[in-house]
Regions:
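Glycine-rich, proline-tolerant flexible connector loops at the mouths of alpha/beta enzymes
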Residues: 71-91, 144-151
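Catalytic domains of carbohydrate-active enzymes, especially glycoside hydrolases
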Residues: 56-73, 136
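Conserved beta-strand positions in the central sheet of alpha/beta enzyme cores
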Residues: 69, 103-105, 141, 237, ...
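Short amphipathic alpha-helices and their capping/turn segments at secondary-structure boundaries
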Residues: 54-61, 84-96, 126-134, 252-254
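Active-site acidic/histidine proton-transfer and metal-coordination neighborhood
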Residues: 14-16, 20-23, 93-100, 110-207, ...
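Flexible loop residues that form catalytic
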Residues: 73, 109, 145, 240-241, ...
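Histidine-acidic metal/acid-base catalytic patches
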Residues: 2-41, 48-64, 187-293
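N-terminal small/glycine-rich loop or linker at the start of catalytic domains
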Residues: 33-43, 101-111, 147
Length: 293
């Protein structure tokens, strides 16, 4: 073996070990890295909800999940109540680490028949967009949270889209993104998300695929995926890749096929005894799926 081959082999093996993978075939890992620029990160949904910010960053560094979506009202404490100096400290903590603060996971919603409630959610979205900018993040996750039965569906869809356009204009002006999670009773059905986005005009408003069972309704995963993929942003939410019956390998195949290069964010629901080991396991499963795509 010549020197270049030896060096190439060493680099391949080092990269695999650093990602927490079982050393299978280094050339397969090299092919995987060439094939996709997707990255696995963490939503502080269950596995990170009780970690303060230094612990959260350290645990993500330790496990190779190098992006974080900060879910609202969790132990990280990153909220709009932070002072300017505290916001600067959050930004510095991420900057001094290998972990990216992808954004904020809020519960703002725009479907209510109560217009005062809708306005409160819009203004709350804007306040948290300011927070995201000041901590070095790039956007905020929001969601439709249903479609009320007592209101014509078309009216609610138009109201959600109009709210997203207002928030999106504000976001675009400060270099942020609105990430709309596919969520909510009826609203999470892909044709309804499509109907919302057909009325969205702001380029800073993007869709966050959420791996719901409704994705599989006729005409099926691939057709539903293709019907909305032009609106995808830089985040996707998944659950544990090796738990349940959602066809994650098929989904990863679709993302690789479209050369998706965003964050695949783990929104885990289980309660493992060792969350660090579980995070490492999910990274290994993710890398294998991308390698097989």
């Amino acid at each position: 073996m010549n020197l270049n081959q030896s060096r190439r082999s060493f680099i391949q093996k080092s990269l695999i070990a650093g990602a927490g993978l079982t050393l299978i075939d280094p050339f397969s890992a090299q092919a995987m890295m060439k094939k996709s620029k997707m990255k696995l990160g963490l939503v502080t949904y269950q596995w990170g909800k009780d970690w303060d910010l230094p612990t959260l960053i350290a645990n993500c560094e330790k496990t190779g999940l190098l992006g974080i979506e900060l879910r609202t009202e969790h132990a990280h404490g990153v909220e709009t109540t932070l002072s300017a100096s505290q916001r600067a400290d959050v930004k510095k903590r991420f900057a001094d680490s290998s972990v990216t603060c992808v954004g904020y996971g809020a519960n703002f919603e725009y479907h209510s028949p109560d217009q005062a409630a809708v306005r409160k959610n819009i203004e709350g979205t804007k306040a948290y967009l300011d927070l995201c900018k000041e901590i070095g993040a790039t956007g905020i996750k929001v969601k439709p949270n249903g479609i009320p039965n007592e209101v014509p569906r078309e009216k609610t869809i138009a109201q959600i889209a109009a709210s997203l356009n207002e928030c999106g204009k504000y976001a675009g002006n400060i270099g942020q993104v609105i990430r709309v999670e596919v969520h909510g009773n009826i609203s999470q059905e892909i044709p309804n998300m499509k109907a919302i986005f057909e009325q969205v005009t702001e380029k800073s408003v993007k869709m966050c695929w959420n791996c719901n069972d409704q994705d599989l309704l006729p005409p099926g995963l691939e057709a539903n995926f293709n019907s909305v993929k032009k609106w995808f942003g830089d985040t996707v939410h998944i659950r544990e890749l090796n738990v349940g019956e959602y066809p994650y390998q098929d989904l990863m195949n679709l993302f690789v096929k479209m050369n998706y290069d965003g964050w695949i964010l783990l929104e885990a629901r289980t309660e493992p005894a060792d969350r660090i080991a579980a995070m490492k396991e999910q990274l290994e499963v993710f890398n294998k799926m991308i390698g097989n795509a």
